[in-house]
Every structure is written in structure tokens, then in C-alpha cells.
């Protein structure tokens, strides 16, 4: 009866009174007989060397009085060496295996052999005989003794501890009147009535089972596992070529169930060629597997005239990684989830840090000029710096700037008034480049106002690649840390995942999503900046945040977007997203938004974001002649005062008792200054009132040039720029990058030089703009807008419609005149213009000839087509006359090019 199941066909060939198997001669010869002492076990490792199992403390208790060389078998006795390490009792001897004697966890620490030759067998037996039932509860020998009742008719002859398995083998002798099965049953009943609790785990008790097989006492590093590999081997008594019978699952269950709960029995696959045949028996607990291995290893079972010897070994159970397998088999679900988790982690960790840096950037928390130490030092040294630097150097420039700001005081007051009103619309300041729009708004209209964020679109649009665009935008708003390089890496990962799984992972972000993310974080930071006073006042109980922002427009932050629509064709996405974000800012009353642009067609772009709003707009023009003169004289006055300051020391050294007569150099310098001032009025009329041109003139005058020479060089430089950028540009560049042609640019230059201003619609109807042969310049209106964006011309509007076309800068008027006076350039450009007109007329002739050929192919000439044929013939004649005239003019121009240098 095994585990409650009666196995009739089996006969256990183990040891005990009824055992028929006896140790072989080699085994008996290999063991050492001790007088009055238990038998020991010896393991041979090779010729000339030996290893006693008791070399490991608590692992073996072989007692021997002989030396290793005398106790081991001879080197030629191979059969004896093969059987070393097995427990083979004699008649009336049996073995029990006690579990829960040692902790299993110690086997991973004390797996190595201990370097000692001590003999513990006699000591263990003495301790077993002397130990009491009431003391030494932590002593394993005491636990073994307490587990064996005194009334049990057995005599313990040997104790073999197994630290690795957490138990111990106990060999005993018994009388012929008892059997090992009865002794096992008595021990089990005794432990059930009086359980022995181990000290290391009081929730379990010591278990005991009879050893039915031939245990193998090895000291290999094979830690116990819950899975046993059961190999079905032929018995040793049979021949090597004999086969064994594979046990069924029912038989294995009957053998192993008594030792513990089984979770699974897995037989060897039928198509497997591995021999010997095997099966896997999985226990729920590891100690149950240890008990089964130590009790059943080497058990021989006979069935139907065949015998099978069981060979048991531990085997690591392959755990089913269901989560990992599901994860790897569903990448289309897992990868987007991972991307979402990564995005959530970024939002939770980095967004508060980035928001903090944006607030610090807007409020200027990290600026040196806002620190208390800097302000204290500036107050202490203000008198010295003002007296040395500003009194003689900056007063002239300040005077010129004051004249400039006085002319534009109305604009400054209007902008400041709009910033104090509640209006959910944009403030747009439009002016040509060099008109001082940025200085007007930031230095004057917003002077002394806190919480101003300036976003310059020029470096953002001109940045190389998406990473550069993101980095420049982040720098403009103070958004940090920013990992612009990570998007390139994420794009590569996304591409690899898409190539393998067929679906995008979502790790990479588009340029649009990254821009929106940065602007969204900036909006959150700006809202906190605008509500800073609201939180300090504790107004939360009275009004809400939105109501507070609507009622206090002076508390809102100000966003200045400079160079809006700079290179409109290159940064359309950036401009659209900034405009949408700015619209959200003004509509939610978070901040005022001021756009600074030099593009007169800004309303097309901004109207997409605020289609139902009227913008508050200001247009800046050139300075008047009087203000421009004051501005230049202000710079020159500062230079004169610097020179007078340098001459103070020389004047003091002179005789100060009487008035000193001026020298000839002073008289000549004074007369030169008067001549320059007389020339300045005419030069300013030529130069115009563009602020950048006036500063350029002032710098040249400071260097010692006369106004006439300075103006001449400025005009020459402007002419060279026009020739290089508009007239002599390569055709490939024009067709791929520009929407205008050199012929159209020359047409405007020639006409503006003679008429100063042109009617917009008249230019559109001219053959050069209406029928251009350049593919990229076929749209005349787009060509004019492109030339205006390039600042060659300026388009003025009247009641919202384009009216006139003028030179892009006042100095360009003089440059246009100078270009038309160059005979060679004029002949060359007119030749190109006439050639294009000739091509236009030739195309008209081709169209007329095609239609005439179609009409002539009719079988009968109806009377109704007579008028059409007459019209076409007249048009053909007119075009041919024009071509003839153009050919004569082109011949004359070619003659000029041949003669002139």
C-alpha cells in the first residue's frame, strides 16, 4: 500500500527483512568495517586520491579508523568505485529520512566543502545518546532523538546529516519480529501525536519516511527543486542492453503522492528519442520533492516480468513567463502603451521643472541686473558712471533718440493705453526693417513694465533642422531642460519598430507636437505669473482666477513676438502655431500679445487665428527730414563733446590769463564742420528717414567722411546689393527659390526711377507681370508681394487695397536712378526684358496659328467664322509688328553692349 493506492503487480526490491538484494562484493570490499561502530561511506575521486564525505560538516558522518589509502578500493576495482556514495544496508538494517532538520536556505551559503578531516560519526552518536528531550531544541541531533520514541524497538547505528537537503539519514537495526514499514508507521503516528517543531520554522514539523531505494550521497552543487526528473533505468543485475518499462502516470502518482501534494506529472513525449525514458514529477513544495528523492532514488520495481530502477534528480522548472510572452507577442498594443507611460513620466517629472524655468525667464529671476547686489553697486557708483560716460558720450545720442520718440509719442501712448484695456485681440506694430519697431515697443512702450516675454522668430525660422528649431524656440521662452537630440533617436526607433511590426511606436514626436508642447508649458507658466499678485492678495474667496485676469489687465504678462513673418515661406508652421497660441493667450486673458512685423500682409496670417476680431494696429514710417537731421546731429554732438573733453588738458596748460587766439587747424575744422552741416540737409533728403540708414550715415560722419561722400558710398553699396540680389541672380536660384524674375525686378527699378511711384494695377497689367515666361513668376501679384518682402519695393494700401508701389527704402530711389544711368547694365537688362516680350508675342502668334489651322481644317468654310478669322489675322499682324519693333530695339541694345565697356 503506497500513498493509499495498492500496487498489486509491483514488488519493492529495497532493503529490510524481506529484502533480497545484498551488497555486491565490490561494495562490501569498499566499505570499512568498524568494531562496535556504524558503517561509513567512502567516495573515491580517482586514482591515488580520496574524499571522505565527512569532510563537509553536517553532510556525512562516516566513521573510520583507517587511512584514506587503506579504506578506498584499489584503482583497478572500477566497479567498486562506481558504486561509492550509496547507502546499502545489511540484513535487519534499514534507513529513515528525517526532514525539517536544517533550513533549506543554508544550502546556498554552505555549499562548498569544509577543509577538515575530523571524524564526526562517533561524536554524533555520543551526542545522540547523551541528548535529552527537554534541552537543546536548536540541536539537530536532539530534534532527531525527540522524533524517535523510546518504546520503538530499534537501535540507531549511524546518522548522516544532509545540510543541502535540510534533513538527515538515520540508519538503524531492528529485530526480525518487526519490519521497516511497521517502524515507519509507528514513527509517523508518534510525530502526528507529538509533533517536533524545528527552531527555524515553528509552523512546520519534522517528518519521517522510510528509505525504500538506494540513496546517493553526493556533494555536488545541485540545490533542491520542486521538480524531479524520474528516469526509468534497467536494474544493475540485468545486462546493459536490457530495456526498462516506462511507468504510467497512475503508477507515478501512487509512488510519489505519499510524500506531498503533486502539481503535475509530465511524461516524456512519445516522439522523443532520448534514452532512458523519463517523466517529470512536479511537487507543490520543495521539501516534498526532497523527501521523495531521498526515499525513492534507486528503487527497483518489477512489473510483468520486467524490472525498472528509478533514478531521481532535481531539475529546474521552466517558469511560464506569461506576462513577458504576452508583452512580446502583442507589440501593437504594448509599444503605444509604453510610449504613453513615457510621455506621462515626462509630464510628471520634467514639466514642473520646465515651467519653473519659464517663469524665471519671464520674471528675470536669474538676471544679474535684477539682483540686489547689482542694484546696490549701481546706486553707489551711479554718480561716477553718469559723470564720466553719460555726460559727454550719451547725451548726444539721447538727444537724437528723444527727437525720435517725441515724433512717435502718440504711438507709444496708444500702445500703453491698449495694454491697460481688456480687449481679446492682438496689438500689431508694422514697419519696414530699420524703422525701430523693437526699440519703440520694448524700450519705450514697455519701459518699467514687469513680466515681459520677447520671442524673436528670426533665429527660430532660420535654425537648421527640426532639432535646431525646437532648441531655438526653447531658448526664446526659457524652456529647459530640452532634449532636442532625443527626437532624432526616437525617430530611428520608431522607424525600426514600424519596419518590424508594421505600426508606429509613437516614441517620436512631430515638429508640430513639440512646438505645441513647449507653448503649452509656456502658457501655464505665464498664467501663474499673471496670477502671482492674485495669490498674494488672497482674492480667491472673492473672485475666480479668470474674473481676476479680466478685471485687472494691468497684471497680465506681455508677450512681444518680434520678426513675425520673417521668411514667411520657410517657417509657415512655426508662424501658424505661434499665432494660434497667441490667440489662446489673449482670449483667455492670460497675457497681452504684441506682434512686430515688417510684412504688410500680416493680416492674412493672423486672421486665421482670430477671424472675428479687429486688430489694434500701428504703422511706422520713415522719419521726417527735421527729425532725421536732429537724430544725426545728436550723434555728432556726442562726438564733439568727446573731442572737447580730450582737449581740456591742453587748454588748461595754455595761458589762461587772456583769451587765446584760435589756431589755423581750429579755423579749418570749424569751416569744414559748417560745410558738412550745409551738405547734411541735401544728404538727408536723399537718404530718407530710415533709422538704420541714419545710424549708418552717423557712423560714417564720425569716421571723418563728408556727408556727400558718405551718401555716395551708401548709394553705391545699395546699388551693388540690388544688382547682386535681384538683377544678376542665377536662373536656377530664381526658379527654385524666388517668385519673381530679374525682368520683373528691372521693370520696377526702371519705372520707379522715372516716376517715383507706380499704380499697383497698372503694373499687374503690364506684359512683364501678366505674361511672364518664368514659371515661378507667372503669378504677377505673388511676384509683387515677393519683391516687397525682399524690400526692393514697398506697397502702400488705401482702405485695405494695394494702391501704389514705391522704392523699398528711401535710399533705393537714388540707387534706382544710378542703376538706370549705367549704360551697360541698362542695355543688358533691357535686352532681357525685350527678349521676354518677344517670347510673349511669339506665344501669341503660335496660339493664333493653331486656331487658324483648326478653322482651315473644316470641310466647308461657314460664313460665321469669317469675323473670327479676320480677328485672328489682325492679332497675328499686330504681334508680328511688335516683334519686328522689338528686334530693331534689341539690335540697338546689342550694339551698345558691343561698344560700351
UniProtKB/Swiss-Prot annotation:
It is found in: Mitochondrion inner membrane. Residues 60-332 are mitochondrial matrix. Residues 1-59 form a transit peptide. The chain crosses the membrane at residues 333-353. One of its GO terms (cellular component) is mitochondrial inner membrane. Residues 644-672 are annotated as: Disordered. Residues 354-901 are mitochondrial intermembrane. Gene3D superfamilies: 3.30.70.330. InterPro entries: Mt_escape_2_C, Nucleotide-bd_a/b_plait_sf, RBD_domain_sf, RRM_dom, Yme2_C, Yme2_RRM. SUPFAM superfamilies: RNA-binding domain, RBD. This is Mitochondrial escape protein 2. The gene is YME2.
